[in-house]
């Protein structure tokens, strides 16, 4: 049977995501009459009368007062250099209505392509709002369009906005105040409110300890509205931390003393661990002063999201921050770094060089309290000096000879290559397997046989059980809940060294990251890669070198890998497993193929664009040929081992569209077909197919009917053939849905036909939908073809509150079996510089979240399994392909298993068919011993050898500094300088201080 149970976190239905935001302006400059008169280079003008006001400020000390005398006579905030909001989804603004009547107003965004004629409304986006009488409200403007009353120009570009207009929609004169314009492009799901104990801290070296908060320091000067106390609830160092309750906005803490950090290095930063265990985001600001500052210094800021714990740091040189993933990958070759900068982009004030030998104050203060809150609390711990992560020097020699973090020590770090070589045999001797399943890993007590997908399966099938739950069915006829691990191969363990195939493109920064480059498993011409500072050049696999040191050969590694899967209770080798493992004869596997890339592929017409690439034209004859070539490749890979073949994935995370943006990305790929030339049938088979469908199935009455629906003026069907850029209009929606379905159906059906020709009666598992790349139309088309639907789901669970209620409803309505191709959680306590797509606070938290996710999947009637991505941690210095540097493995880069993860997996996998497996918990006294359910002795056993030494101890902390006069923190809004040009690894990055 399928077990119906949920963890407490899922059953409690975690809060919906909260928004993170970046400040654009809060109008703190004195003069906005011209962009030349203020450091933000903004201009406020227009037909309405506007002025800077100290009344009704919602962020900082000032707002803009706008006096409107008639409808559609605007006040406009201009940025003539334009804002790039391409990565954002929402612009928000605080509006104060001091009048006794409600006021309806409009916001209109203008992009720079409207120049020079100022008449093309397609370059604008307009929406309407109502602010209630005598209230302050925050309004959100959808940068992608789609609101009920929004007019979103088909050519509007959110990455080049030059103007934000505010205007009345009625003629009654009114006064409104505007403040705190922000943009928002990401969300965070807060964890349960009970918080975590001993949460993570950034794995970077401490140069000097400032404060560990075991007690409240006597040199701390809190403002009158701040209450401080020690806490043990959230601790990153020692046994206690400091909780600071802020009872009013712009309250702060001042650590006052004298510190000498001049000898710690040229580029350093002050770091502190901060936790926000509330339901509201908090803006936190910092100021660092020296003996000469006299209260005049730059303010830098960061958003601490609801439920978030992280390390933040303030650069003592004010080096520019790499705030986006694209910037980090481009400059460093790393997707993420382990701490968040207090940045100039989120602060204000000109930086003045500090005398690091005479630092006198460290200040932290918050912005406004969240709406409706009377106080907000942050927990501070482990304040120290670190190398400045904004500067290249922080990454020098970050890896040791085994590719481990060379800056700190941590649990599971291997002490030396000599110790690594001793670890394989003891682990092999401890491994066993679960006893409560059949030879395939199925449930011997369940034999589903209703509504089976395949009439005569060659190996695995999918059927319903007596309770109406979908189940995979193994060759023995038993229910099989597929749990497994992806990417069991060496290909993605390579990292770029910085040596380029083109000497002019080498990265000295990348080269500085390594203390030693192994001589084996080196690819001198890796690439071209997806992204990074070196597009093609030398790459090395530390993991592959380590497995040879640990196990002596790849054959032994493959053997122990399969034995680990059995020991941990996994019954499937997940996607992108090395085909050499297919013949293992013990653990079933999934195979995979690529429809358009690989050897002997013919060129195929490409449609539109996407994160991983455009879509292939499925009507192109070469596409069918390539699919057949792919199917033959898969057949050759699985030949002789078909019995253990669970099913076949083809392609991955294709960019079909996005459900959140009807007028934009939802139908962008479908509309892109019309931008291809169909005048020759061979030039765009997709275009000709679309025209045929429209003429013969949608508009059989003639072209005039299409013109009426689409607002076009085609003289004939032939006139639709040339390439043209069509903008979405509401009259197209039903046609777009129909055509998107046809496109996807042709793709899935062509692939399925090729697979069934070579591998009949094996399960086709689809293409692994990403949340950002699927629409209901495409899902429906896939369901008409594939045997088992597949999704990659990076959420805390598949519960509606965590994932997608609409997607779940569609799955249940379609009533197909579903498998999850990818999910994971990552943490920083393994020495990694990045957690993963979904974060955890520790290895224990990773394990707990993994089990909760699996429980949610196992409890749903349609879901038949889930595979963890991935087997091996990303390289510490980033995956060669795209800089991915996550702690998401079941093993580290020394091939050391994460014991907390493997123990949790074993206990869940043992119990997923209904057995009480609590005796396998690593909390039991006889945890490592064999028993009735498990033949191994591996529970609670670490395979990392003796503890690795600490690379270096920090400088002794100074004696508590003398007590200077008490100082207060003054509030301020978001004024900022215009541009800062600084170097990072020889690459000059032009950085805007605000969005």
From Swiss-Prot:
Classification via Gene3D superfamilies: Galactose-binding lectin, Glycosidases
Which spans does this entry mark as compositional bias, Pro residues?
948-965
UniProt keyword annotations, A-Z: Glycosidase, Hydrolase, Signal
Q: Where is this region: Disordered?
A: 936-972
Phosphoprotein among keywords: no
Q: Which GO terms describe its molecular function?
A: beta-agarase activity
- The answer on whether this UniProt entry bears the keyword Hydrolase reads yes
Q: Which Pfam families match?
A: Agarase_CBM
Task: Please name the InterPro entries in this protein's record.
Answer: Agarase_CBM, Glycoside_hydrolase_SF
Q: Which family does it belong to?
A: Belongs to the glycosyl hydrolase 50 family.
What is the protein name stated in its UniProt record?
Beta-agarase A
């Amino acid at each position: 049977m399928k077990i119906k149970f949920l963890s407490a976190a899922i059953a409690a239905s975690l809060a919906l995501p909260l928004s993170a935001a970046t400040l654009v302006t809060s109008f703190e400059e004195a003069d906005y009459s011209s962009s030349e008169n203020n450091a933000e280079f903004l201009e406020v003008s227009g037909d309405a009368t506007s002025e800077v006001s100290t009344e009704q400020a919602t962020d900082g000390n000032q707002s803009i007062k706008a006096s409107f005398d008639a409808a559609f006579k605007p006040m406009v905030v201009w940025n003539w250099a334009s804002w790039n909001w391409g990565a954002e989804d929402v612009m928000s603004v605080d509006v104060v209505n001091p009048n006794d009547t409600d006021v309806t107003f409009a916001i209109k965004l203008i992009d720079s392509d409207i120049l020079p004629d100022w008449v093309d409304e397609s370059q604008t986006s307009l929406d309407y709002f109502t602010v209630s009488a005598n209230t302050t409200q925050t309004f959100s403007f959808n940068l992608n369009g789609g609101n009920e009353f929004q007019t979103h120009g088909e050519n509007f570009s959110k990455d080049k906005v030059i103007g934000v207009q505010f205007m009345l929609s009625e003629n009654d004169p009114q006064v409104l105040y505007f403040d705190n314009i922000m943009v928002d492009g990401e969300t965070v799901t807060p964890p349960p409110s009970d918080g975590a104990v001993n949460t993570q801290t950034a794995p970077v070296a401490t140069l000097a300890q400032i404060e560990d908060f075991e007690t409240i320091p006597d040199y701390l000067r809190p403002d009158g509205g701040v209450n401080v106390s020690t806490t043990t609830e959230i601790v990153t160092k020692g046994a206690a931390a400091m909780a600071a309750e802020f009872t009013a906005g712009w309250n702060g803490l001042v650590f006052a003393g004298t510190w000498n950090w001049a000898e710690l290095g040229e580029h350093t930063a002050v770091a502190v661990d901060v936790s926000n265990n509330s339901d509201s985001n908090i803006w936190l600001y910092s100021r660092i002063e020296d003996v000469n500052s006299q209260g005049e210094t730059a303010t830098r800021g960061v958003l601490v999201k609801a439920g978030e714990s992280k390390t933040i740091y303030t650069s003592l040189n004010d080096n520019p921050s790499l705030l986006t993933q694209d910037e980090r990958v481009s400059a460093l070759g790393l997707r993420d770094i382990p701490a968040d900068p207090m940045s100039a982009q989120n602060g204000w004030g000109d930086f003045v060089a500090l005398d690091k030998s005479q630092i006198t104050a460290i200040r932290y203060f918050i912005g406004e309290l969240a709406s409706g809150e009377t106080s907000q609390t942050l927990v501070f711990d482990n304040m120290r000096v670190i190398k400045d992560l904004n500067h290249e020097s922080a990454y020098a020699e970050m890896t040791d000879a085994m590719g481990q973090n060379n800056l700190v020590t941590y649990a599971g770090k291997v002490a030396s290559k000599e110790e690594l070589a001793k670890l394989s045999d003891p682990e092999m001797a401890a491994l066993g397997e679960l006893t409560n399943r059949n030879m395939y890993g199925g449930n011997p007590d369940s034999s589903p046989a209703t509504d089976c997908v395949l009439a005569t399966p060659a190996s695995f099938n999918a059927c319903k059980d007596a309770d109406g739950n979908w189940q995979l069915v193994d060759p023995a006829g038993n229910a099989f809940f597929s749990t497994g691990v992806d990417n069991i191969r060496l290909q993605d363990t390579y990292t770029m060294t910085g040596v380029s195939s083109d000497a002019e493109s080498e990265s000295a920064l990348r080269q500085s990251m390594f203390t030693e480059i192994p001589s084996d498993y080196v690819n001198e011409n890796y690439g071209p890669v997806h992204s990074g500072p070196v597009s093609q050049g030398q790459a090395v696999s530390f993991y592959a070198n380590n497995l040879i040191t640990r196990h002596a050969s790849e054959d032994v590694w493959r053997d122990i890998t399969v034995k680990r899967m059995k020991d941990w209770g996994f019954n499937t080798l997940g996607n992108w497993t090395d085909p050499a493992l297919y013949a293992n004869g013990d653990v079933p596997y999934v195979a995979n193929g690529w429809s358009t890339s690989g050897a002997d592929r013919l060129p195929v017409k490409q449609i539109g664009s996407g994160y991983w690439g455009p879509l292939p034209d499925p009507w192109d004859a070469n596409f069918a040929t390539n699919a057949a070539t792919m199917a033959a490749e898969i057949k050759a890979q699985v030949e002789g081992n078909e019995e253990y073949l669970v099913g076949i994935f083809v392609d991955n995370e294709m960019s079909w569209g996005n459900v959140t943006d009807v007028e934009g990305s939802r139908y962008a790929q479908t509309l892109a077909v019309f931008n291809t030339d169909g005048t020759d049938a061979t030039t765009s088979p997709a275009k000709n197919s679309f025209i045929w469908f429209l003429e013969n199935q949608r508009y059989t009455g003639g072209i005039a009917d299409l013109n009426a629906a689409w607002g076009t003026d085609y003289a004939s069907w032939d006139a639709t053939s040339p390439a043209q850029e069509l903008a979405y209009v509401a009259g197209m929606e039903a046609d777009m849905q129909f055509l998107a379905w046809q496109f996807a159906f042709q793709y899935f059906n062509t692939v399925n036909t090729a697979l069934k020709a070579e591998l009949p009666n094996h399960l086709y598992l689809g293409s692994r939908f990403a949340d950002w790349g699927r629409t209901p139309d495409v899902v429906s088309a896939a369901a008409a073809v594939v045997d088992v639907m597949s999704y990659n789901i990076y959420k805390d669970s598949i519960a509606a509150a965590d994932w997608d209620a609409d997607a779940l409803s569609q799955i249940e309505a379609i009533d197909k079996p579903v498998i999850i191709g990818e999910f994971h959680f990552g943490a920083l306590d393994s020495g990694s510089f990045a957690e993963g797509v979904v974060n955890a606070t520790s290895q224990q938290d990773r394990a707990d979240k993994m089990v909760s996710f699996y429980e949610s999947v196992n409890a749903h009637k349609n879901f038949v399994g889930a595979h963890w991505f991935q087997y091996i941690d990303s390289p510490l210095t980033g995956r060669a392909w795209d800089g991915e540097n996550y702690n998401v493995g079941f093993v580290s880069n020394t091939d050391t298993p994460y014991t907390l993860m493997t123990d949790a997996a074993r206990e869940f996998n043992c119990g997923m068919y209904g057995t009480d497996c609590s005796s396998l918990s690593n909390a039991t006294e006889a945890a490592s011993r064999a028993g009735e359910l498990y033949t191994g002795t591996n529970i609670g056993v670490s395979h990392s050898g003796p503890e690795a030494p600490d690379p270096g101890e920090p400088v002794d902390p100074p004696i508590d500094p003398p007590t200077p006069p008490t100082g207060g923190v003054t509030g301020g809004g978001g004024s900022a300088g215009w541009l800062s040009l600084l170097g990072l690894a020889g690459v000059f990055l032009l950085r805007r201080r605000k969005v």
